[in-house]
UniProtKB/Swiss-Prot annotation:
Belongs to the NanE family. Signal peptide: none annotated. This is Putative N-acetylmannosamine-6-phosphate 2-epimerase. One of its GO terms (molecular function) is N-acylglucosamine-6-phosphate 2-epimerase activity. The keyword Transcription does not apply. It comes from Salmonella paratyphi B (strain ATCC BAA-1250 / SPB7).
């Protein structure tokens, strides 16, 4: 059974939750052993996969969890706005560390390495390639280039203003166009995640609402302050 077939089976059985285990950078939780513990807890709670940034985090998590890991490396580049897995060496390192799926930025922005080359390198390692996209055009272009999975990860993050709500219309448009879609980005409640499935998502990635304690506390603090004013 291929990994995609296994994921199809697991998603059908459990609903399709993927947990992004990426603490706020510099947080007390931003340690490989804590990231790995989050990943294990997510697996035990029914997640079909986890998404992890960084080689050290991935390597430690891989030793604990049996579910597939979507691996990424984030970089801040002077010459490009692309942050997610921008280099071929990043793909190689993630493959060696144990990623089953490698995600790359799939937007049509200036970049050090072409999306096509990154996807080909992922497939060279016999792994699944995921493209993190911001639009229908991005998603369809990446699908034509061979991406196995299209994520809505970058929707709302390539422009100055990020909306509060997730991009459900993008999920539907990509699904209707024949893409295997992972809905990601601002799915901060179970209701929104469920709505993504109704719009055609194959699975839904949730990050901040599960693994970023600072964000969750901020939401509660803002609500309490507003109620008290």
């Amino acid at each position: 059974m291929s990994l995609l077939e296994q994921l199809d089976k697991n998603i059908a059985a459990s609903g399709g939750l993927i947990v992004s285990c990426q603490p706020v950078p510099g947080s007390p939780l931003d340690k490989p052993e804590i990231v790995a513990a989050m990943a294990l807890a997510a697996e035990q709670a029914g997640a079909v996969a986890v998404r992890i940034e960084g080689i050290d985090n991935l390597r430690v998590a891989r030793s604990l969890v049996s579910v597939p890991i979507i691996g990424i490396i984030k970089r801040d580049l002077d010459e490009s706005p692309v942050r997610i897995t921008p280099f071929l060496d990043d793909v190689d390192a993630l493959a060696q560390a144990g990623a089953a799926i490698i995600a790359v930025d799939g937007t049509a922005r200036q970049r050090p390495v072409a999306v096509e080359a990154l996807l080909a390198r992922i497939h060279h390692h016999h792994l699944l390639a995921m493209a993190d996209c911001s639009s229908v055009d991005d998603g369809l272009a990446c699908q034509r280039l061979g991406a196995d999975i299209i994520g809505t990860t970058m929707s709302g993050y390539t422009t100055p203003d990020t909306p509060e709500e997730p991009d459900l219309p993008l999920v539907k448009a990509l699904h209707d166009a024949g893409c295997r879609v992972i809905a990601e980005g601002r799915y901060n409640s179970p209701a929104l995640a469920a709505e993504a499935i109704r719009y055609g998502a194959w699975a839904v990635t949730v990050g901040s609402a599960i693994t970023r304690l600072e964000h969750i506390c901020g939401w509660y603090n803002d609500a309490l302050k507003k109620a008290a004013s």
